[in-house]
Amino acid sequence: MSQTFYKKGFLALAVATALGVSTFVQADLKIGVAGPMTGANAAFGEQYMKGAQAAADAINKAGGINGEKIKLVAGDDACEPKQAVAVANRLVDQDKVIGVVGHFCSSNTIPASEVYADAGVIMITPGSTNPQVTERGLDAVFRMCGRDDQQGIVAGDYIVDVLKGK
């Protein structure tokens, strides 16, 4: 996925959370970036951080959001569900983030999203494709990618219609 893709999602999260906290006074707008910073999927966590940092730098350089600067707070879930819940609790309770970009693995996003939803913290996942991420009707949980049950149909149609079954 391109850095532009992550920047757009990060910008959407930043604007959405800023609008929701316009009366909340704080020196920085803290946004969590949660994903696998270590382990077999660490490359994805690195991409998350690079994209989020590029977006935060651009927004901050332009004056921030309502004059407030974005500060990123990283959370390494290593694509382990228990660790993801611990990261979510830390981001909400200790770091006091107003929004989260992440998690990557659906198996992490589903339990971590419960923590964010309970706290009223917006979460946007750039990579979790399991339909349950958004089917549960949690108000503050969003995704920027297709669902597993949609991707197969689109891929199948492409193979039949464009590649002619090759």
Where are these regions (language model features)?
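Extracytoplasmic ligand/sensor domains, especially the bilobed periplasmic-binding protein
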Residues: 82, 94-166
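Bacterial N-terminal signal peptides
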Residues: 12-22
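Boundary at the C-terminal end of the N-terminal hydrophobic targeting segment
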Residues: 25-27
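Structural motif
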Residues: 69-94, 151-154
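Bacterial N-terminal signal peptides that target proteins for export
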Residues: 2-13
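Extracytoplasmic "Venus flytrap"
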Residues: 32-51, 75-82, 104-107
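Second-shell loop/turn segments in exported
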Residues: 37-41, 74-77, 98, 139-145
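Signal peptide-proximal N-terminal region
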Residues: 49-72
